[in-house]
């Protein structure tokens, strides 16, 4: 069974490391970003190069 996780702020810093860790554990990753699209795309490409079709990006402004 595949598991999927949505990681907010995953394009940089701690969120990025969390995404990489879950990817190493075999999870599908949804990478959230607000304005760091290039960083999110780079991370998705990095994850997908090791585990094809397991990472996707989504943009959302989560300010409340």
Predicted feature residues:
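Conserved glycine-rich cofactor-binding loop
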Residues: 4, 9-13
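Structural signature of beta-strand start/N-cap positions in the alpha/beta core
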Residues: 4, 28, 54-56
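Short, conserved SAM-binding/catalytic segment
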Residues: 43-51
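Conserved glycine-rich Rossmann-like NAD(P)H-binding loop of the short-chain dehydrogenase/reductase
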Residues: 25-42
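Aromatic pocket-lining residues of Rossmann-like dinucleotide-binding sites
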Residues: 22
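Rossmann-fold cofactor-recognition segment
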Residues: 50-64
């Amino acid at each position: 069974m595949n598991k999927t996780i949505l990681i907010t702020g995953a394009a940089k810093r701690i969120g990025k490391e969390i995404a990489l860790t879950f990817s190493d554990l075999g999870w599908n990753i949804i990478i959230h970003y607000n304005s760091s699209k290039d960083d999110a795309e780079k991370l998705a490409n990095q994850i997908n190069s090791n585990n094809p079709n397991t990472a996707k990006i989504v943009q959302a402004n989560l300010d409340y």
